[in-house]
């Protein structure tokens, strides 16, 4: 036999003649009148062939011809003349009558084969599928005749195997039952159940049917990452482990001792070594492959845009690799998506979402500790806290603070998550808190994620001086948890009085509360304090003690453990506010006669406008301003251009860390005796730095030296213990009386502005402190730079800045858009509209290339980029693998990190470029030249920050009021100029 096959031409001729002369249709009845019928019942998968094919430039019968092409040839493949004579008699059908087809044709190794796709009864007519077929790719060996001998030998072996199997079954023909080559009709969708049934019928192909030279029956030993070809599976396995960091020996073979790092390699090994060959049919044509890689390459070459990611286990194809990975969880019995409430796991995320929609108890479990809003997953809570922490205290803040009052030593430190978990599991929780959380694990997770760990705050805070009061200690450099803000201004120290060093020793709750009072809480006006000099210290103490007996102590401090430090103290150190718009200033001028009538009415009108950022007024039965000394009542005066509006609560963190030191002494609210001890130079400097003081004592204008703060607020935005009349809590009166003499005798230091070097500002901003960059915009760093700019000329402060109503409304708009189906709250209406589509199922964004539709436009764009355009812009630097989405690349890089190789993360996701843009903005800001006119801007100029729809900062100039204030204080400012136009430019260079 070896000598016979040495002569290639002779062997080829003999084999071809043998195949040609053999009767191929012994089980078929070929009628002269037309038509081919089955003589005996035919099983599904019975094959007929091989029938020789020839190349031609123009086919004789287009119905039997196949389009063929190669690198240098484009033509047709058609059966030879001796075969085509009877093949023409087989009736063919197309789309209209495709259901009648029980026979299909295909080309294997250059030969034509026919195969039944269903059970055919005896006497039934054979009908072939005549729809257009995919072009045949001819390799160079076929064109050159180099492997024609091997193809003929394989075909002969197939015929011998078919004959032997037919003899055993009693047919004695050329048919051979085998696996179904068409698990679904051409162009139809895939059915996994049908495929599994067919695979159970017969999953093995005889060795004679395997032809490794053909693309359809061959196996592609190729790296799917870098597309390198290897001669055997062992070399490919070593390559994947060494070059692409696959886990070694993860998939063992059940029939031998070999192990592989990739499951497709195991499947190929079982097919090659153990003849366990699986079939992967093309959805768009009749081709069937033994290797999913060949099927994928076939789809990309001949069916552009179709799903080209087949599953190695079942053959189902997917449009993306991520969809295939999610599908493979079904075969691996891995259920990565588990419900956090009932611990039920699913293989697909959509099934988990459906489970949560059907079970209300699994939907709302984890609650935000700030606004008490419920979430179903920790991921949703984390996204919510990014928005929630940037705004003011929520409507449920009182409840949270009250719980801390009841258990002042039971809550763990915010920067120690392990202590949080321990305290949650061991300490008894209040009844309200236990009802809010479904499990201790969820509560511990919420407590642990309140704030990231702070390396500089590893010790417990100082013990409180009195029950109900927050601890009072030295200010740390870094901020604490927003839930436990500091009780004094931080970041840079001020004079000793600010740290409590110059005050008297705290021996009573009254003096303790005095330490908590904002230093600008006390009136110190030159024009009005003379009218109140008749009130002595004895009267102050007497009235305060009597009022203390009537009111309980808890009322004064209700909900102030956190708020007294975050809201009341900071508001007391801000400059006096001015109106939000010109219309409000005109209304103030119209209401001046009403305010002059009585001090109570005047205080009520002024305070009602000064606290316009608050939501609701307090009950009317609280004490009025007449019950306490007039020196202590808040009298909000408007000087027509020199006041700053109190910032919204989302800006309070910045003002806590960057206090204006030149206002501190003025905001102490010093009495008349203490004010007289100041030198004339000091008072003139203060008057120059606060333009807008009227020389005549009028009830509607107060000196710029003593801007009064806003009243303290509770968590819900309501006034804690201040009436509409603007009265101060009587506790404040007693506190001032107890400490009045000490304050009067305390030393006063000249105030200076803090000086910050530009490099220090950039370094501080680079470190990523949370109070320097706010989520709604970057107003924090702008205000910081503005404060540094004013240090160059302390006698000429920047013009007043007015905050628009958008920053005020921003505190409440986050509760405005709620879902009527699940109660979820969104900050903007667009977010709510997009969320409602998850309940209604609306998909208003259809794809123009396919029949898919999406509820979100970004998902449609991503679908077009990844599926139809095949864009892969994100590349892994470690293994050169490309991805269509950044999240997929990040997930892929994490796999590298989890293998213990400590690879760095993708540079595209590190945010380096974004931070550099921030630094460029800082440098541009610091290189500007600021004057009062240039900073104030033209009339109506506004500056809007990105990602801040509800909050904006309007820089407007009230020229009339500004010039009026300048003329009022021209006598005191003669040394520095008569008006604001004489101000010199302040240049800040980096």
UniProtKB/Swiss-Prot annotation:
Q: Please give the tissue specificity annotation from the record for this chain.
A: Expressed in the developing peripheral nervous system (PNS). Expressed in the ventral patch in the cephalic region of the embryo from stage 5, and continues in cephalic region through stage 15. Expressed in the developing PNS from stage 11 to 15, with a transient expression in each PNS cluster. In the ESOP lineage, it is first expressed in the IIIB cell, and in both ES and th cells, although it is only transiently expressed in th cells. In the ESOP lineage in the adult, it is also expressed in the IIIB cell and inherited by its daughter cells, as in the embryo.
Region described as Disordered: spans on this chain: 164-196, 392-440, 554-633, 667-725, 892-913, 933-990
Q: Where in the cell is it found?
A: Nucleus
Question: Which InterPro entries does the record cross-reference, listed alphabetically?
Answer: SET_dom_sf, Zinc_finger, Znf_C2H2_sf, Znf_C2H2_type
Q: Name one GO cellular component term.
A: nucleus
Give the residue spans that cross the bilayer: none
Residue stretches of biased makeup (Polar residues): 900-911
Pfam families referenced in this protein's UniProt entry, alphabetically: zf-C2H2, zf-C2H2_6
Q: For this chain's UniProt record, which GO biological process terms are given?
A: dendrite morphogenesis; negative regulation of cell population proliferation; neuroblast fate commitment; Notch signaling pathway; regulation of dendrite development; regulation of DNA-templated transcription; regulation of transcription by RNA polymerase II
User: Which residue intervals are annotated with compositional bias (Basic residues) in the record?
Assistant: 400-412
Residue spans annotated as Zn fingers (C2H2-type) read: 221-245, 251-274, 280-303, 309-331, 337-359, 366-388, 817-839, 845-868, 874-896
Q: What else is known?
A: Was named 'hamlet' because of its 'to be or not to be' role in ESOP cells differentiation.
- Report the function annotation for this chain: Transcription factor that plays a crucial role in external sensory organ (ESO) that elaborates from a single precursor cell (ESOP cell). Mediates the differentiation of lineage branch that generates the internal 'ES' and 'th' cells (external sensory neuron and thecogen cells, respectively) from the IIIB cell. Its absence leads to re-specification of IIIB daughter cells into external tormagen cells (tr cells), or internal multidendritic neurons (MD cells). One of its role in the development of the ESO lineage is to modulate the activity of Notch and PAX2 signals.
Family annotation (PANTHER family): GASTRULA ZINC FINGER PROTEIN XLCGF49.1-LIKE-RELATED (PTHR16515:SF49), PR DOMAIN ZINC FINGER PROTEIN (PTHR16515)
What's the protein here called?
A: Transcription factor hamlet
């Amino acid at each position: 036999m070896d000598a016979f096959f040495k002569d290639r031409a002779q062997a080829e001729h003999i084999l071809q003649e043998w195949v040609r002369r053999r009767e191929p249709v012994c089980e078929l009845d070929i009628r002269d009148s037309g038509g081919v019928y089955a003589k005996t019942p035919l099983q599904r998968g019975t094959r007929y062939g091989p029938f020789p094919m020839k190349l031609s430039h123009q086919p004789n019968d287009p119905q039997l011809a196949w389009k063929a092409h190669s690198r240098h040839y484009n033509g047709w493949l058609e059966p030879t003349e001796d075969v085509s004579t009877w093949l023409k008699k087989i009736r063919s059908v197309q789309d209209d009558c495709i259901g009648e087809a029980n026979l299909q044709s295909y080309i294997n190794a250059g030969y034509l084969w026919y195969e039944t796709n269903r059970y055919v009864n005896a006497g039934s007519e054979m009908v072939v599928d005549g729809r257009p077929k995919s072009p045949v790719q001819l390799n160079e060996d076929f064109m050159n005749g180099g492997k024609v001998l091997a193809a003929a030998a394989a075909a002969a072996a197939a015929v011998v195997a078919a004959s032997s199997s037919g003899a055993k079954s009693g047919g004695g023909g050329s048919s051979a039952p085998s696996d179904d080559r068409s698990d679904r009709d051409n162009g139809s969708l895939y059915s996994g159940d049908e495929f599994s049934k067919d695979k159970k019928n017969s999953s093995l192909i005889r060795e004679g049917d395997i032809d490794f030279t053909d693309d359809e029956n061959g196996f592609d030993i190729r790296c799917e990452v870098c597309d390198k070809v290897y001669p055997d599976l062992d070399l490919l396995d070593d390559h994947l482990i060494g070059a692409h960091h696959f886990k070694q020996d993860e998939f063992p073979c059940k029939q031998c001792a070999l192990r592989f790092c990739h499951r497709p390699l195991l499947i190929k090994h079982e097919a090659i070594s153990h003849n366990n060959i699986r079939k992967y049919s093309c959805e768009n044509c009749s081709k069937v492959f033994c290797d999913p890689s060949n099927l994928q390459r076939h789809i990309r070459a001949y069916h552009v845009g179709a799903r080209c990611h087949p599953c190695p286990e079942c053959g189902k194809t997917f449009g993306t690799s991520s969809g295939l990975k999610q599908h493979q969880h079904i075969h691996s019995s891995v259920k990565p998506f588990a419900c956090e409430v009932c611990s039920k796991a699913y293989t697909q995320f959509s099934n988990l979402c459906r489970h949560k929609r059907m079970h209300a108890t699994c939907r709302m479990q984890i609650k935000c500790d700030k606004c008490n809003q419920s979430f179903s997953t920790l991921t949703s809570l984390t996204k919510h806290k990014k928005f929630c922490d940037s705004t003011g205290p929520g409507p449920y803040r009182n409840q949270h603070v009250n719980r801390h009052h009841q258990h002042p030593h039971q809550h763990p430190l915010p920067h120690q998550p392990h202590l949080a978990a321990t305290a949650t599991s061991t300490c008894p929780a209040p009844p309200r808190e236990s009802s809010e959380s479904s499990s201790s694990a969820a509560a511990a997770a919420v407590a642990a994620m309140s704030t990231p760990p702070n390396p500089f705050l590893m010790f417990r805070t100082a013990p409180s001086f009195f029950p109900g009061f927050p601890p009072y200690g030295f200010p740390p450099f870094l901020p604490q948890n927003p839930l436990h803000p500091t009780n004094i201004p931080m970041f840079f120290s001020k004079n000793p009085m600010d740290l409590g060093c110059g005050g008297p020793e705290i021996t009573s709750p009254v003096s303790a509360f005095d330490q908590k009072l904002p230093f600008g809480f006390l009136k110190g006006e030159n024009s009005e304090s003379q009218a109140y000099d008749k009130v002595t210290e004895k009267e102050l103490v007497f009235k305060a003690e009597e009022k203390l007996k009537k009111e309980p102590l808890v009322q004064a401090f209700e909900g102030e453990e956190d708020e007294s430090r975050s809201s009341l103290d900071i508001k007391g150190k801000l400059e006096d506010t001015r109106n939000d718009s010109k219309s409000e200033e005109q209304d103030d001028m119209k209401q001046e006669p009403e305010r002059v009538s009585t001090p109570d009415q005047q205080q009520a009108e002024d305070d009602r406008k000064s606290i316009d950022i608050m939501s609701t007024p307090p009950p009317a039965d609280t004490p009025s301003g007449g019950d306490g000394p007039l020196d202590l009542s808040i009298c909000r005066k408007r000087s027509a251009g020199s006041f700053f509006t109190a910032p919204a609560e989302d800006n309070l963190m910045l003002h806590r860390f960057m206090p204006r030191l030149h206002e501190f002494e003025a905001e102490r609210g010093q009495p008349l005796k203490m004010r007289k001890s100041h030198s004339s130079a000091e008072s003139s400097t203060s008057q120059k730095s606060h333009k807008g003081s009227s020389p005549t004592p009028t009830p509607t204008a107060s000196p710029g030296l003593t801007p009064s703060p806003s009243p303290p607020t509770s968590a819900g935005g309501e006034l804690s213990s201040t009436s509409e009349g603007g009265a101060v809590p009587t506790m404040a009166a007693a506190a001032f009386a107890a400490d009045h003499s000490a304050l009067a005798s305390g030393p006063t230091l000249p105030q200076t502005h803090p000086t910050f070097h530009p490099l220090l500002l950039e370094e501080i901003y680079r470190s990523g402190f949370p109070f320097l960059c706010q989520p709604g915009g970057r107003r924090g760093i702008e205000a910081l730079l503005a404060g540094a700019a004013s240090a160059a000329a302390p006698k000429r402060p920047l013009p007043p800045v007015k905050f628009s109503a958008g920053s005020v409304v921003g505190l409440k708009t986050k509760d405005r858009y709620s879902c009527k189906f699940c109660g979820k709250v969104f900050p903007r209406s667009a977010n709510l509209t997009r969320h409602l589509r998850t309940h209604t199922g609306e998909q208003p964004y259809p794809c123009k290339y396919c029949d898919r539709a999406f509820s979100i436009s970004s998902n449609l764009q991503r679908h077009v980029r990844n599926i139809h355009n095949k864009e892969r812009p994100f590349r892994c630097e470690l293994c050169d693998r490309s991805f269509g989405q950044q999240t997929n690349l990040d997930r892929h890089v994490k796999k590298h990190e989890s293998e213990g190789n400590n690879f760095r993360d993708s540079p595209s996701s590190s945010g380096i470029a974004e931070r550099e843009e921030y630094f460029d903005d800082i440098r541009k800001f610091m290189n500007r030249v600021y004057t009062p006119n240039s900073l104030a801007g033209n009339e109506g100029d506004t500056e809007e920050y990105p990602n801040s729809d509800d909050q904006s900062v309007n820089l407007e100039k009230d020229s009339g009021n500004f010039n009026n204030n300048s003329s009022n204080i021209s006598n005191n400012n003669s040394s520095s100029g008569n008006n604001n136009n004489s101000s010199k430019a302040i240049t800040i260079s980096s």
